[in-house]
Amino acid sequence: YADEIRGIVEGAGLKITELSTHLQGQLVAVHPAYDDLFDGFAPEAVRKNPKARTEWAVQQLKYAAKASQNLGLNAHATFSGALLWPTVYPWPQRPAGLVETGFKELANRWLPILNTFDENGVDLCYEVHPGEDLHDGISYELFLKHTNNHSRACLLYDPSHFVLQCLNYLEYID
């Protein structure tokens, strides 16, 4: 099946460079305040059930790892989700340890997925984006720390929203 799809695409003079699971990645880690907002990204069968929605999203990412491998791809694009995003502004003050706890949980959710991507020989590239727990270089480095610098946890470079994030699109590469 993958060979057929790749053949159709290549027959049109195009090449598949990566697949994307931005919406499914978002659903791996949803802060409860955003449950209703993000339910629309999931199938009706798992809406209004955060646990089932998360399980569905995790499985979709694992399927995507295999699909990427089947298509001969070595990179895959996604979002990290946002357990901590509602606390990004430091008022009111966050309780001590909240950020560490949040990133430990984020890593716990993503490690099985990262391992599946590793088993399939595919890098998982997170787009740093407003509204995501991975929204800049510092948050990405904290995520790496909690995933023990997982070799498949990579960045997707999309500077289209860097002005909104007050990030210099050239300095960011360094």
Regions found by a protein language model. Give the residues of each.
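Residues at alpha-helix caps and immediate loop-helix transition turns in enzyme cores, especially N-
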Residues: 1, 136-139, 168-169
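Aromatic-lined substrate-binding rim segments of carbohydrate-active enzymes
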Residues: 1-13, 18-19
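Short amphipathic alpha-helical segments and helix-helix/interface helices
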Residues: 2-6, 114, 141-144, 173-174
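Long amphipathic alpha-helical scaffold regions
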Residues: 5, 162-164
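Active-site acidic/histidine proton-transfer and metal-coordination neighborhood
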Residues: 11, 28-157, 164
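Short active-site-adjacent helix-start/loop capping segments
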Residues: 17-18, 25-30
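Non-cysteine beta-strand/loop elements that form the S-adenosyl-L-methionine
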Residues: 17-21, 77-79, 154-155, 174
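A short alpha/beta connector and helix-capping loop motif
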Residues: 146, 165-174
